[in-house]
């Protein structure tokens, strides 16, 4: 059995990464993000992840002590921090970090902190509610599905990295025509990716779970209804990204404070009621309701106060995402071979992936031809420039 001391020490070690990043690198990360140089942060993160994976694999193969293993892996945060800090210091030599802070420029900081806290509540509520209302077995089952969704959300976050600063610049210069055009093209590109990612998620999550939990007998991890609801919640969480990103770009934290508060209350109240009535599925339905409310709210708030555009176009694009996902998932109803290994699952993912790309590309060309061609030209131009 694992002792309390081991668990406590392991928790401290695992928390080092976040603490070190917050206290030593947070300022440089903010600076790079504001300057739209997120690629530096991404590069440092990739280096850290690769080295961390190598260390964990090698030390696990040699059956090293778990505290030593994660201690060595966590120590790599120094390399990540070093890359970011060195780049920042070499490229922003004109900055005086000892200058007197301009408190007026940060007058919205408490509004930002408030919304960040509500964001933590939004993402952490299902786990907390399941722990209080259900049992640890339910939490264990939920964690498997949530791991998949967290990975998908991480992939999607790559495509919006650095964009809020760019949109914020257009908003500050009041270039509404350019802003509307850019936002429209971004919506088409983002919803293109979202349709593929979550269409495949609906089709592949259960085959993945069956392979990932093969041999585990402590709980029944194969729960299709829960898988579907969790993926739906992830979709509703991400489908509002283009609109919520503009809120960040415009710095409209105070104006949306009560709206975000309602979102947090919905997941707590309806999640608790749903947990009592339907277990983990009920909790996730409460989360779905919370994200649906926020999606509808942003669908009308953003055009009215930021872009001065009609919300109808965004609504139709969201509906097109839903249709694309249904068509992509439809293939799994016709062709769904049993997966007994990761190789079989990977082959199935390739087949579904090709189908998803064909479906989404065809729909984008049919209904968003102008914006889709413009996005493709930008991508080709970017590739040629890199080559």
Regions found by a protein language model. Give the residues of each.
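Helix-terminus/linker motif at the lipid-water interface of multi-pass membrane proteins
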Residues: 1, 58-63, 121-151, 169-170, ...
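Interfacial transmembrane-helix starts/ends
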Residues: 8, 106, 175-192, 196-204, ...
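Helix-loop junctions and terminal segments of transmembrane helices
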Residues: 33, 92-93, 149-187, 243-249
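Interhelical loop/hinge segments that connect adjacent transmembrane helices in multipass membrane
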Residues: 82-124, 128, 166, 174-181, ...
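Membrane-proximal transmembrane or re-entrant/amphipathic helices at the cytosolic face
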Residues: 332-387
